[in-house]
A protein has these predicted regions:
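A beta-strand edge to alpha-helix "cap/lid" segment located at domain peripheries
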Residues: 1-3, 67-145
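Short, flexible active-site loop motifs that bind/organize anionic cofactors or intermediates
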Residues: 15-16, 49, 121
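Short, low-complexity N-terminal intrinsically disordered segments enriched in polar/charged residues
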Residues: 1-32, 140-145
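Hydrophobic pocket/interface hotspot
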Residues: 11, 26, 34, 55, ...
Length: 145
């Protein structure tokens, strides 16, 4: 598991340095049947995001959807915690929606399930209200008056 943790830390570092444009290091960690899920699927996007994304080709579609709609402003890793078959990444991220130019910033948690040294499941937890606001799906708090 320590090797996976080190490779995961390197993948996040490359992702952050590229501002969300080079997911290749993540692909190297995936099992062929990886399942990518996001809290945003149900709470914000509904069926529009098309998740969960199952398999490496679907994972590519996931990252393509992000690249087409969002620009990473910054991201940082605060901790990577491993226990049994789970690895949890804890950090912060800021993204700008390319259509609305609104930003969403805040804590982010990714939960990875690992078997035989490969990621078989990934769950992303990020600010669903902030994402909906950046997409123009809900009004800014200050605009409600």
């Amino acid at each position: 598991m320590e090797e996976f943790e080190a490779r995961l830390a390197a993948a996040y570092e490359a992702w952050h340095v590229s501002r969300g444009r080079t997911p290749e290091r993540f692909f190297e960690l995936y099992a062929d049947d990886i399942e990518l899920r996001s809290i945003l699927e149900a709470s914000v996007y509904g069926e529009h995001l098309g998740g969960p994304f199952i398999g490496k080709s679907a994972a590519l579609a996931y990252f393509t959807a992000i690249a087409e709609a969002w620009e990473m402003i910054e991201a940082t890793t605060e901790a990577i915690i491993a226990r049994d078959d789970k690895v949890v990444w804890v950090g912060r991220a800021s993204w700008r929606n390319l259509k609305s130019l609104q930003t969403v910033s805040g804590p982010k948690v990714d939960v990875w399930t690992v078997r035989n040294g490969r990621a078989v499941d990934y769950l992303e937890v990020f600010d669903s209200y902030g994402t909906a606001r950046a997409l123009g799906m809900v009004a800014d708090k200050g605009a409600e008056a």
